[in-house]
Amino acid sequence: MTSEQIVYLDENDLIKFCGGKKFKTILADPPWQFQNRTGKVAPEHKRLSRYSTMTLEEIKALPVESVADDNSHLYLWVPNALLPEGLEVMKAWGFQYKGNIVWEKVRKDGFPDGRGVGFYFRNVTELLLFGTKGKNVRTLQPGRSQVNLIRSMKREHSRKPDEIIGLIEKCSNAPFLELFARGERNNWTLWGDQANIDYEPDWDTYANATKAKERKKTKE
């Protein structure tokens, strides 16, 4: 089974795309706006312009609750500086916060990757908030022994580790929906303007990024 794909248009487009289908598990990586929190390193800053961002109110307005099953799980990526906003979004989408998974970004040698940014501290972690909707919505049996930490190398800006997918598939029920997805994936429904097989970053980035090594070989 191949992934379903669509180009992101607006919030109503999500309902049309899902066509009445309800999802037991939703993974979302919204294009957050940092505004004054990180200044020139924010993704919406004109110097970077890596992808379009959305305001908090625009993200909250997405009809995620309408495409979520009555008994479902939500996994929501949020930068450390925007934790309060992430909790707002989770509530607006009809989910109750239950916990989180921490992504520790590491170098090849396994030590923390200090190339991150941050106004008060140099961030080497990112949070994946976990919330539930409905009744009898505990994680599946493997989830009850799963630690809430993953360690992996960074890829291109904002790209999340693939390791999280296997974790989610073990801990939560299908059908699976990913919002603001990149690339393609079997057994998931993918929604986003970068959800296609040809996706790769078009800016200089880390060596571990999607197809970065292939581009390097081409230049040589």
Predicted regions and their residues:
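Class I S-adenosyl-L-methionine-dependent methyltransferase catalytic core
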Residues: 1-220
